[in-house]
Regions:
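Acidic, low-complexity Ser/Thr/Gly/Pro-rich repeat segments typical of extracellular/periplasmic
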Residues: 2-126, 146-164, 170, 177, ...
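Multi-bladed beta-propeller domains
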Residues: 107, 113, 145-161, 187-207, ...
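Beta-propeller folds
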Residues: 126-138, 161, 181-183, 201, ...
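Beta-strand C-termini and the immediately following turn/loop, strongest in propeller blades
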Residues: 129-136, 154, 165, 173-179, ...
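Structural motif
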Residues: 136-142, 180-186, 227-234, 271-277, ...
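Conserved beta-propeller blade repeats
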Residues: 157-175, 201-221, 244-267, 286-309, ...
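Flexible, glycine-rich surface segments
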Residues: 317-319, 329, 333, 337-345, ...
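C-terminal structured domain segments
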Residues: 394-395, 402-413, 417-420
Length: 445
């Protein structure tokens, strides 16, 4: 009887142990799913981990390792079952992001993980986006510079007029041509490639859409069909769908461009100068400028760089680089010498280096084309990256790594020749032709 009681006790103990283990296994935290499930990540694409139990965020952070180390924002759903990683900047192209959770991670019930978890995602290479063909109805394409693999992003019969890439590299805003001189402003999500109608410009020609850095306001150029109407700049509020018309009816406004710091720059053909507007506090500035055209913002939003014509004689009027400091409200001529003409400035995606096109106006050094130069604003040093006298170099687009740059070149000695998009390493000067008959290059993750 004693033997039977002892045997029964052992069986009961084993049963209790098994039951406890089963209960513990059922209550223990596990990872049910990760997103994305497969393939690479790009841009600021979030990574999500779904748990079966409510988790302790502090415990997660103590046992979490991200390789390579990278600044991310970690957010949780209200139930603490969904953890999302969003990079502060775009994921590093060409790297593999690895997220590891070691043993010891606990749930809200203080029950720990029983095993380690490691997940990895390759980061897709940065792609070049461009318009093609230059001699027809152009649409948006992208190409992998390493493999040469290309993909068509849009297929609008009327063609894409122009486009811009958002500051967070998540979307492209672009305008398409419709019948009777009208257009539409569209957007494309660079992760899903889903397209959305933003503004149906049924009575106007809308062009040059530019989204503010905070993603709240879309600036664009609008030309109404009314006789005698001048182009203007409109601001479309994406939150409340309201619209603001900048300027007055008798002013000719063009070329809107948002800074990373939230200022909008645009050119006023009527008053001959650049206007700057901060929508947060309604602050305005004005920079007199006879030349106009496109400018470029520095990565920190402090400097605006453009070109200005200088009258230095009866027959000599070169255009020089004009740097405007929004903090000090000062201007500086960056072009040295009266016989140099500098145009088309484009700041790097980081730091204070910028690209521009230069040609000499002196009779002995004059050439049909303009060459690509790079200048560092901090050191004042400048370097020529091309030396092809017949070619015009323009449309400079810096790679996010700050080392490579795409540009368009035109043969000024043979205007029937198609434009080409080239890629150059700004350190070595090594250049590679990527696209024939394409234009307007830009970079997307």
């Amino acid at each position: 009887m004693v033997f039977m009681n002892w045997k029964t006790g052992v069986l009961i103990a084993i049963g209790l142990l098994i039951g406890g283990l089963l209960i513990g296994w059922q209550l223990s935290p596990r990872i049910d799913e990760v997103q994305p499930l497969e393939g690479g990540i790009q841009g600021r694409q979030p990574i999500s981990i779904y748990f079966n139990r409510a988790m302790d965020p502090k415990s997660i952070e103590e046992h979490l390792e991200l390789t390579p180390p990278y600044d991310v924002e970690i957010s949780w759903d209200p139930e603490y079952k969904l953890m999302t990683f969003t990079p502060v900047n775009i994921w590093p192209s060409g790297e593999t992001v690895i997220i590891s959770l070691s043993r010891g991670v606990r749930s809200k019930l203080r029950i720990p993980f029983w095993q380690e978890f490691t997940f990895s995602w390759p980061v897709n290479p940065t792609s070049l986006v461009y318009l093609w063909p230059a001699d027809g109805k152009s649409n948006l394409y992208k190409v992998n510079p390493d493999s040469g693999e290309s993909q068509q992003l849009t297929n609008h019969p009327g063609g894409v007029l122009d486009y811009s890439i958002t500051h967070d590299n998540d979307q492209i805003y672009y305008s398409i041509a419709e019948g009777s001189g009208t257009s539409k402003i569209m957007s494309i999500d660079l992760q899903s490639l889903e397209k959305s109608l933003i503004i149906d410009c049924s009575e106007t020609l809308c062009a040059l859409p530019q989204l503010s850095a905070d993603g709240e306001r879309l600036a664009y150029e609008a030309i109404t069909r009314e006789p005698g109407a001048l182009p203007g700049i409109r601001i479309f509020n994406l939150r409340d769908q309201s619209e603001l018309d900048l300027g007055v009816p008798d002013e000719y406004l063009e070329n809107p461009l948002w800074s990373p710091a939230g200022w909008l720059a645009f050119y006023n053909q009527t008053t001959k100068g650049y206007q700057f507007w901060n929508p947060v506090n309604d602050t305005t500035r004005f920079l007199p400028n006879e030349t106009g055209g496109y400018g470029s913002w520095s990565a920190d939003g402090r400097y605006f760089l453009t070109s200005e014509i200088l009258f230095v004689g009866d027959t000599l009027a070169p255009r020089h680089l004009q740097l405007y400091d929004l903090v000090e409200e000062t201007t500086q001529d960056l072009s040295v010498g009266n016989f140099l003409e500098d145009l088309n400035p484009s700041f790097s995606t980081s730091g204070l280096a910028f690209a521009f096109s230069r040609k000499s106006l002196s009779p002995q050094d004059w050439t049909p084309g303009r060459q690509l130069w790079v200048m560092d604003l901090e050191t004042g040093e400048s370097t020529s990256l091309t030396d092809e006298v017949d070619y015009q170099h323009t449309s400079f687009a810096w790679h996010p790594d700050g080392e490579q740059m795409a540009y368009v070149r035109y043969n000024q000695a043979m205007l029937s020749e198609a434009p080409e998009i080239w890629l150059v390493n700004t350190t070595s000067g090594e250049a590679l032709r990527l696209i024939i008959n394409g234009f307007a290059p830009g970079w997307i993750p």
